[in-house]
Amino acid sequence: MKRVLVTGANGFIGRQCLPLLLARGYEVHAVSRQDVDQSSPGVVWHNCNLLESESRAHLVTQVKPEYLLHLAWYAVPGKFWESPENTEWVRASLDLFRTFEKVGGKRLVAAGTCAEYVGNAGECHEEKTPLLPSTLYGSSKHALERELHSCSKRGGLSYAWGRVFHLYGAHEDPARLVAYAVRSLLRGEQAVCSNGLQLLDLLHVVDVASAFVRLLESDVTEAVNIGSGNPVVVREVLNEIGRQIGQPQLIRLGAKPSAPNTTRLWANTVKLAKEVGWAPHYDLAGGIKQTIEWWRTIGDPKGSRTPGSEPGIDCR
């Protein structure tokens, strides 16, 4: 049986990867530094702080995975862009990768970000669009990918780097835009938004997870964009939420200040579709429907968002 170690396994993307990996016959070892429900059939949970070198080394040498899906990072909405923890995660991740290779690891896939690209690039192509990150988060992810690239050339480790664009869906942080809008309308409250003219690439988190699993199983190497490939104006997303919930009048476009430069950023997904062989399950309307249903039945629409945070859509 193929053995995989998944970091960030209790996170937004990671939790969606676990059932997909189990369905494909993997022995799944999941890492979290938080207490989690360990009753997931077939998943072996490990409580580990990956920023601690001894704990990290012990985990990898104990599990001896053939595959590594590295999704863990500091990702508190609104804070992760310039957090010093970004540089800590670069160092910890590199050490994790080296230990993985030493114990006989064969294939490594890690999560990158669309924030590695130059801002407002429009359509982003893995080999053509300039990589000029403007945040510490984007710079740290890019630096890690460059180091991983060098390591793979020296040692022969097979790796791929999934550059995640904008995502939404079940278990989304309430401070992010789609979750904020859905929860506000389900409470019968206004969703106070900017003008919504941003042109972005939105992909349901289940599809993001399936893309990562498919990438892990492929022999495709280096950077691969993970997105829908279909840019959408944010106000159309918000209006779709209002339409499906039946409260379109509660979407308050232009009620809060907009950024001076309207963001335009989406993925070229030719490599993902043709080389990796992946296609999304959800279109936008279907993904929004599933998200609304999740918040209605499982989520907590009456809860409040993270104190001091403002709603927004973040690159992973």
Protein language model regions, located:
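Conserved Rossmann-fold NAD(P)-dependent oxidoreductase catalytic core, especially the SDR/UDP-sugar
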Residues: 70, 94-136
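C-terminal substrate-binding subdomain of Rossmann-fold SDR/epimerase-dehydratase oxidoreductases
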Residues: 185-316
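NAD(P)H-binding glycine-rich loop region in Rossmannoid oxidoreductase-like domains
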Residues: 50-88
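Flexible, glycine-rich beta-alpha linker
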Residues: 117-118, 135-136, 160-177
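Rossmann-fold cofactor-recognition segment
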Residues: 41-52
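Active-site Tyr-X1-5-Lys
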Residues: 132-160, 186
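Short alpha-helical oligomerization interface
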Residues: 77-92, 125-133
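N-terminal Rossmann NAD(P)H-binding glycine-rich loop of SDR-like oxidoreductase domains
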Residues: 4-24
